[in-house]
């Protein structure tokens, strides 16, 4: 009786381990998929903020020396454009000035386009392309495309954190911090 019980428990554990391994295989992302997921996640958060923040407060600065809310978003979008251009082997454009994007709608559209363009390049590159090397337009160092992408994802995350402070100082709650409906 005792041996039968032990055999059943061991058999059950082996089946469970097999199922867990099969499930893990199915959920493992390829390198380019992992980059794309992170890229899209921070993009979603920043776009939600850009769409949510009142247009009347788009030029709000917590302190005079800081960028405005709009300028922060434009800086992120311009940095995304830098990634896209470098990954494609092109010269980056430099048009993130607030004078080029006067309305909330224009800022939001540019931010959305910058994340969409970056996502398209990541998809186009795939795993092999993520391992290709490029020269960073900012630091002039040679990096893999995936490292450049992760650097920009981190950069966007840093600005997301700064914009959370803008929300709080303006007496608002950022979209990600609100209770889920």
Regions found by a protein language model. Give the residues of each.
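Bacterial N-terminal signal peptides
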Residues: 7-17
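N-terminal beta-strand motif that seeds the catalytic metal site of vicinal oxygen chelate
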Residues: 26-38
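Acidic/histidine-rich alpha-helical segments that form the ligand environment
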Residues: 38, 102-136, 143-158
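Positively charged n-region of N-terminal signal peptides that target proteins for export
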Residues: 1-6
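Feature for soluble, non-membrane regions of globular proteins
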Residues: 23, 120, 177-181
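Surface-exposed helix-capping loop/turn segments at secondary-structure junctions
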Residues: 52-58, 122-131, 168-174
């Amino acid at each position: 009786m005792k041996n039968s019980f032990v055999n059943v428990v061991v058999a059950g554990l082996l089946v469970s381990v097999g199922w867990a391994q099969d499930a893990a295989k199915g959920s493992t992302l390829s390198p380019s998929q992992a980059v794309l997921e992170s890229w899209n996640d921070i993009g979603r958060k920043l776009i939600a903020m850009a769409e949510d923040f009142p247009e009347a407060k788009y030029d709000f600065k917590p302190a005079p020396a800081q960028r405005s809310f709009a300028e922060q978003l434009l800086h992120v979008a311009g940095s995304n454009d830098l990634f896209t251009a470098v990954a494609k082997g092109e010269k980056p454009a430099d048009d993130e000035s607030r004078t080029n994007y006067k309305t909330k709608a224009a800022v939001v559209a540019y931010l959305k386009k910058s994340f969409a363009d970056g996502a398209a390049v990541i998809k186009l590159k795939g795993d092999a392309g993520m391992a290709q090397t490029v020269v960073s337009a900012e630091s002039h160092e040679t990096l893999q495309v995936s490292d450049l992408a992760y650097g920009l994802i981190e950069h966007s995350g840093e600005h997301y954190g700064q914009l959370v402070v803008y929300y709080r100082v303006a007496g608002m709650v950022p979209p990600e911090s609100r209770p889920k409906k």
